[in-house]
Regions:
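Short, well-structured alpha-helical segments in soluble
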Residues: 64-78, 177-190
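Periplasmic-binding protein-like
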Residues: 80-86, 132-133, 190-197
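N-terminal glycine-rich anion-binding loop in soluble enzyme alpha/beta folds
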Residues: 2-69, 137-142, 146-174
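Glycine/small-residue-rich loop that forms an oxyanion/phosphate-binding "nest" at active or ligand-binding sites
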Residues: 70-115
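C-terminal functional extensions of proteins
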Residues: 218-248
């Protein structure tokens, strides 16, 4: 029997690469990303980070300590164009600069985006300064998110929250119930409704909500995916996921 050595031919990197750091207990974020980017020429990779419950500032900071390790394991020794940290309250708790530093320790050439910073960019792009804020968090964590948006210069016209303490419970909120709850939000004086948390099933109902409420609706995942696509220059408009994606 003859054995023949054949030289392989390797592809060169062509599509932009997205690396998502998803919370281990998040049901929604991967699905939302895939639903938006499935017809685009991008490569999408995911690694999960341990989430500590209950969701408190202290536990969210503790979670962020593993960001470098988790980032490193997304295609080790390969470049990623944009690393996405998939936690709104976690970014607010730890601080964007801290998250960015930890990501770049593993992927120094990568762009970095997070839900909270992406939300600010999206609101500014749409010239929105007054928002109604909805979160699924505990009262204490809800208030920390509220203060973050205030400190970024936004007026909060109303605020509602679920008072859920565990991330895996947030992902189990019934989508139809959520639509009904958000449909009744007090929007007096608001230019938009922002719904926080990557684990809530908001993105699939955003179009319907905007029609029902006759106002702009933004969510953590929507803003995050939009900003990711902006960073990799793939942000052409897309139907079905709210006004933000139609404004590109």
């Amino acid at each position: 029997m003859n054995s023949t050595k054949i030289d392989p031919k390797y592809i060169t990197k062509s599509n932009p690469r997205i690396g998502l750091i998803a919370l281990a207990s998040d049901f929604m974020i991967e699905r939302d990303f895939i639903n938006v980017i499935k017809d685009r020429e991008v490569d999408f990779f995911v690694n999960r980070i341990e989430c500590y419950n209950p969701l408190t500032k202290e536990n969210l900071i503790k979670m962020s300590n593993k960001v470098t390790e988790v980032t490193k394991d997304i295609l080790p020794d390969q470049d990623i164009d944009c690393v996405v940290y998939g936690c709104t309250s976690g970014t607010i708790a730890a601080g964007y600069e801290s998250i960015e530093k930890k990501v770049k320790a593993a992927k120094p050439m990568a762009e970095v985006t997070t839900p909270s910073t992406a939300a600010i960019k999206a609101l500014k792009k749409l010239n929105i300064s007054k928002i109604s804020l909805f979160t699924p968090y505990s009262k204490k964590l809800n208030d920390e998110v509220l203060e973050y948006f205030k400190n970024q210069g936004f007026e909060i016209t109303s605020n509602s929250y679920f008072d859920i303490e565990a991330d895996y419970d947030i992902g189990k909120v019934d989508q139809n119930y959520l639509f009904n709850v958000l449909s009744e939000i007090n929007l007096n004086g608001a230019e938009a409704l922002f719904v926080s948390c990557t684990a809530l099933p908001v993105l699939p109902i955003i179009d319907k909500l905007e029609k029902k409420l006759n106002t702009t609706v933004l969510s953590s995942n929507q803003a995050l995916i939009w900003d990711t696509l902006v960073k990799i220059n793939k942000n052409n408009s897309v139907e079905g996921f709210g006004k933000l994606f139609k404004e590109n």
